[in-house]
Design a protein with these regions (language model features):
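Residue-level preference for non-acidic, small/hydrophobic
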Residues: 44, 73, 116, 149, ...
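Short pre-catalytic segments that frame enzyme active sites
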Residues: 38, 45-59, 168, 197-201, ...
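Juxtamembrane regions of bacterial inner-membrane/periplasmic proteins
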Residues: 2-295, 312-314, 368, 404
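A penicillin-recognizing enzyme superfamily signal
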Residues: 272-293, 305-307, 316, 324-337, ...
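Conserved catalytic neighborhood of penicillin-recognizing serine enzymes
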Residues: 101-125, 179, 242-258, 359-414, ...
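Acidic/histidine-enriched alpha-helical segments
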Residues: 88-94, 136, 167, 206-208, ...
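Glycine-rich, acidic and aromatic/proline-enriched surface loops and short helix-turn segments
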Residues: 115-122, 155-162, 179, 183-195, ...
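Soluble, non-transmembrane domains of envelope/secretory-pathway proteins that act on or interact
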Residues: 1-5, 485-491, 529-788
Length: 788
């Protein structure tokens, strides 16, 4: 009895050990082979793919297997697939009998389950390994459904050369997804894993045709297809050389590779938000412009299109992809590259100053020769307007007014604002950039720049959705993974920019003159309204254009990846036409809704753009952000006293008060006036004082160059002698005569046109100017000696 009990215990232990061995004999995961990175459009169509790390074209596991492939592979490899548990014993007996009769391996008995095990283990084919495969195949069937087994087989079966898996084979041999293959094409692929090294497209074509046709005949016998379908399928040609896979978004594919961990994606396949048709059209358009630009030595360009309503990227062309021409550097993703932004940050400064109550939309900004601590900005046309409305300065992209605005706003404050806009490339202190920050003195990426304008547009679009409040998640990044988790809404009473500010800024951006025939856009009712801004970096290295409607943000860049500048490489000439052609690919939309509760109507001085003072001559009522009510009153309108004929200014010391006429007069500072009157014929110069009248303390002269306490450098000429600097002063009287003295030494006299070339010695000097009426202007300047 005890002996029998021991036997039972030993048997139970042995059974338990075998059961444990059986259960843990199947490795997890089954396959650890690297897979290709695969990028799909939003509709599931393949956009781009890259080869796996081991040099194989092997797509990640698919969700399902096409029905045609199921029928073909089961008929060809394992006709009792749905009726066995991993091992087909009928096939085993048949194989043993046939092999004994042939005295060699003439037939196999591997089921699809056994083949999956063999593919995962990669062991040599021996009797022992065959038995191990049978054991593990049974275990495999316990844990996996038949559909899962077919899916694993289809993803890992060899299809000749370096092609693994049905999906990769379908694209490599037929150039389209497996779901779209015919019966003949699917039958061809189904016979390849049986002997991929012997029978593959491009080699042994006759044997491949025989195997395919035999399979088609079996499908007829099984009544899966009819004879007519089989005959038509047999007439189809077999593929020859492998085809290249689609590369419609290679730069986005590489971006996905780099960001895979951050995206928390556990597969090398993603379905993106890209619109397949738009992406292909944008690739075509990019190629056209590349051909045009290449003649001027401009090799690279990029375009990004974002759907504002949901923040999804719908088209991503990081460069004109020309891998066969390595000198073009088309592999560089210019959407991620750091480049000088040129003037593309100016709307953000304009908006920030509106939002914080520094200006109104049309506040006059100084546009005169400027030197700030050795920094001398220049307008692109090298001219000066004297003074120009802020919105007009933005639409014309004038540099000097932008620097003046940043000087008023403080570059440290603007730097902090840009950080809140999530510009990731501002990795140096604000002092490193200084005032050049507004003229391209930093580096940005197309991605960050587009996201800044995306955030503004989304905020304005959501004006009604949040009852005038703000979802600060609107300033989050755009996304390109279709099922990417969206950030939670964060509803706040305030935001980076209020609705009224954004609406006013977009209106100013809409007034930019469009290039070429686009300048006539307002004459066509079908032309949509677009807020846009161009940018050109120093040395003509980068050309930008970013635009937006309520539905889309479009950002384009043109230039050379290596930073080489080219003549004509400007935002308006190179990037803007490209951007407007991109907008033509998109559906038109209405303009942004006016956020009336976030705007107020106030009286504004027509001439200065400031909040109207009581003495402003002409007042306009304008919609401005509410903070505009707290801005300064017009500083340029002054009440002056004239004689009865309104010819001269007078005072009560020289003229009867009862005969005086009191007028409000628009008076700019002398330097601003000097340039402003040349561009504005309606500007009236302040009348002179009547002879014998004591003048009020109003400046009649102002130095244009050099400014008070300026340090200047006078370079040497070619012959080694010291050159000359052109000194320039503005006077209110067009007919004034000015006598010039340096350190009390007379150096010359000017009349009407007050410029004089001088060459003072290095050191500190006192400049004294005296006009014909005895009015004096005295200021100090220093000449630097860089020879020391």
């Amino acid at each position: 009895m005890k002996k029998q009990l021991k036997v039972i215990i030993y048997v139970d232990i042995l059974f338990a050990v075998l059961l444990l061995f059986f259960w843990f004999s199947l490795p997890k995961p089954l396959f650890i082979t690297p897979t290709s990175y695969v990028l799909e459009a939003s509709n599931g169509e393949l956009l781009s793919a890259s080869i796996a790390k081991d040099g194989q074209w092997r797509f990640p596991l698919a969700d399902s297997v096409p029905e045609k492939f199921k029928h073909c592979i089961i008929t060809f490899e394992d006709k009792r697939f749905y009726n066995h548990l991993g091992v087909d014993f009928i096939a085993v007996v048949r194989a043993i009998r046939q092999n004994m009769q042939a005295k060699s391996v003439a037939s196999g008995a591997s089921t699809l389950s056994m083949q999956v095990i063999r593919l995962s283990r990669k062991k040599q084919r021996t009797i022992f390994q065959k038995l191990a495969e049978m054991w593990m195949a049974v275990r495999f069937e316990v844990s996996y459904s038949k559909e899962e087994i077919l899916t694993l087989y289809a993803a890992n079966a060899p299809f000749g050369s370096n092609v693994v898996g049905l999906e990769a084979a379908s694209w490599r041999y037929y150039g389209r997804p497996a779901e779209n293959l015919s019966w003949g094409e699917m039958a061809t692929l189904a016979v390849l894993p049986n002997s991929p090294s012997l029978v593959r497209p491009g080699k042994n074509a006759s044997r491949l045709i025989i195997k395919r046709n035999n399979l088609l005949d079996k499908l007829v016998e099984e009544k899966i297809i009819d004879r007519a379908t089989a005959q038509l399928s047999k007439a189809e040609p077999i593929p020859s050389a492998p085809l290249p896979l689609p590369q419609n978004a290679p730069h986005l594919l590489n971006r996905f590779k780099d960001e895979m961990k951050a995206l928390k994606v556990n597969t090398t396949r993603i379905t993106s938000t890209i619109d397949e048709n738009l992406q292909k059209e944008l690739n075509r358009l990019t190629a056209q412009y590349h051909q045009k630009f290449a003649a001027n030595g401009i090799n690279n360009l990029a375009a990004l299109v974002i759907n504002i309503k949901n923040g999804s990227v719908v088209a991503y062309v990081g460069n004109c992809y020309l891998p066969q021409q390595k000198e073009m550097e088309s592999h560089v993703d210019m959407i991620s590259a750091r480049r000088s932004p040129g003037s593309t940050l100016k709307p953000l400064l304009y908006a920030s100053m509106l939002n914080d109550g520094f200006i109104l939309p049309q506040t006059l900004i100084s546009d005169v020769p400027t030197q700030i601590g050795g920094y001398s900005p220049q307008n692109f046309d090298l001219g000066y307007d004297g003074a120009i409305p802020a919105d007009r300065a933005l639409s014309r992209s004038l540099n000097i007014p932008a620097v003046k605005m940043l000087q008023q706003y403080k570059y440290e404050r603007f730097y902090d604002k840009l950080k809140k806009f999530n510009f990731s490339t501002l990795n140096k202190p604000a002092d490193h950039y200084g005032l050049s920050l507004i003229l391209g003195g930093s580096e940005v990426t197309m991605w960050d720049l587009s996201n800044a304008y995306l955030g503004m547009a989304r905020t304005l679009n959501h004006y009604n959705d949040y009852q005038g409040k703000y979802n600060n998640a609107d300033y989050g990044s755009a996304y390109y993974v279709k099922d990417q988790e969206k950030p939670e809404e964060v509803i706040e009473p305030t935001s980076l920019l209020d609705h009224g500010t954004i609406w006013s800024t977009f209106n100013a951006m809409e007034e930019v003159m469009r290039p070429g025939d686009e300048g006539l856009w307002q004459q066509f009712s079908s032309s949509q309204r677009i807020a846009w801004k161009t940018g050109t970096s120093f040395g003509f290295r980068d050309a930008w254009s970013v635009g937006l409607t309520p539905n889309y943000v479009v950002c384009v860049w043109v230039g050379n990846a290596d930073g080489e500048g080219r003549p004509g490489l400007t935002g308006i000439e190179a990037a803007a036409p490209f951007m407007f052609d991109v907008f033509r690919l998109l559906p038109s939309s209405k303009w942004f809704e006016m956020p009336k509760t976030k705007l107020k109507r106030i009286a504004v001085c027509k001439q200065s753009g400031y909040k109207a003072s009581p003495i402003c001559e002409t007042k306009l009522v304008q919609w401005v952000p509410p903070v505009g009510e707290k801005t300064a009153l017009c500083p340029y309108h002054k009440l002056i006293h004239l004689d009865a004929a309104e010819t001269y200014q007078v005072t009560n010391q020289c003229y009867s008060v009862t005969q005086m006429k009191h007028k409000s007069w628009f008076v700019l500072p002398p330097t601003m006036e000097y340039y402003y009157k040349t561009k504005n014929a309606e500007y009236r110069i302040l009348p002179l004082f009547m002879e014998g009248c004591q003048q009020e303390q109003t400046a009649v002269m102002e130095m244009i160059y050099p400014k008070a306490n300026a340090s200047i450098y006078i370079p040497l000429e070619i012959d080694g002698n010291r050159g000359k600097a052109v000194f320039n002063v503005a006077h209110r009287n067009n007919n004034a005569t000015i006598h010039w003295h340096i350190d009390e030494e007379y150096v010359g006299t000017t009349k009407n046109f007050h410029q004089i070339a001088l060459s003072p010695k290095p050191g500190k000097h006192t400049l004294t100017l005296t006009d014909q009426n005895g009015e004096r202007l005295v200021q100090v300047f220093t000449v630097l000696d860089k020879e020391k």
